[in-house]
């Protein structure tokens, strides 16, 4: 094929791709590199057949995560049943080790969901640092959590392992901020990427449907 013919075909293909992206943008369909990004090397997921893994990378220290929480909670009440949602606390800003351990300790006691908003409020509304064991224990006791059991879980070896694994997962995903949502170990979106909290969650819904459809 002559260079001129090849250039014409390449230009046509590029134009076609551009028109496809424009059409997708106009009808509200999420567009890669605009509403979400693809993870260069997809990460393994352990979900049952027919389910889609969705991970929220977050930190209790992050003000944007705090702001996102109410929108996320509303979405969780109505998400598609095939979506298997889980949270993954990441090392972020000051006190990150404690915040990761707080989440995983609560998770081990079956209290993570019930305490999620309360911990966020403690940090961003009450401005508690939660950086000393006695302060953490007192906060948990005030909220109906057995302080002795909680601190045992907080200091457990397994909690440290989970915290390290969460940090590795975040690093391997290629995410560069929180809150970020990872879908099936293949895609990332966020309120920043999708330009809005609800748009990010709508993008998650769309990506989950694509995964279910085998795309």
Q: Residue ranges of each PLM-predicted region?
A:
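Extracytoplasmic thiol/disulfide redox context detector
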Residues: 2-94, 167, 209-215
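C-terminal cap of thioredoxin/glutaredoxin-like
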Residues: 5, 142-215
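Extracytoplasmic/secreted proteins, especially bacterial periplasmic and envelope-associated proteins
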Residues: 53-56, 67, 71, 97-101, ...
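Sec/Tat-exported extracytoplasmic proteins
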Residues: 61, 76-79, 106-110, 123-127, ...
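Solvent-exposed loop/turn segments at secondary-structure junctions
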Residues: 61-64, 91-95, 122-125, 159, ...
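Structural microenvironment flanking redox-active thiols in thiol-disulfide oxidoreductases
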Residues: 78-109, 113-141
């Amino acid at each position: 094929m002559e260079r001129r013919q090849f250039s014409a075909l390449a230009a046509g293909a590029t134009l076609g791709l551009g028109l496809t992206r424009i059409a997708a943008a106009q009808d509200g369909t999420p567009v890669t590199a605009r509403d979400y990004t693809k993870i260069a090397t997809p990460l393994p997921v352990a979900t049952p057949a027919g389910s889609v893994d969705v991970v929220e990378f977050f930190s209790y220290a992050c003000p944007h995560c705090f702001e996102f929480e109410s929108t996320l909670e509303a979405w969780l009440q109505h998400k598609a049943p095939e979506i298997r949602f889980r949270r993954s606390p990441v090392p972020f800003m000051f006190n990150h080790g404690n915040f990761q351990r707080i989440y995983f300790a609560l998770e081990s006691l079956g209290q993570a969901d019930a305490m999620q908003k309360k911990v966020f409020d403690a940090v961003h509304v009450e401005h508690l640092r939660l950086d000393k064991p006695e302060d953490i224990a007192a906060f948990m006791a005030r909220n109906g959590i057995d302080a002795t059991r909680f601190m045992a879980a907080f200091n457990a070896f397994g909690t440290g392992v989970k915290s390290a694994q969460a940090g590795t997962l975040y690093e391997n995903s290629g995410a560069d901020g929180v809150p970020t949502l990872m879908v099936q170990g293949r895609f990332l979106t966020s309120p920043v990427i999708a330009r809005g909290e609800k748009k990010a969650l709508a993008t998650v819904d769309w990506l989950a449907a694509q995964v279910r459809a085998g795309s």
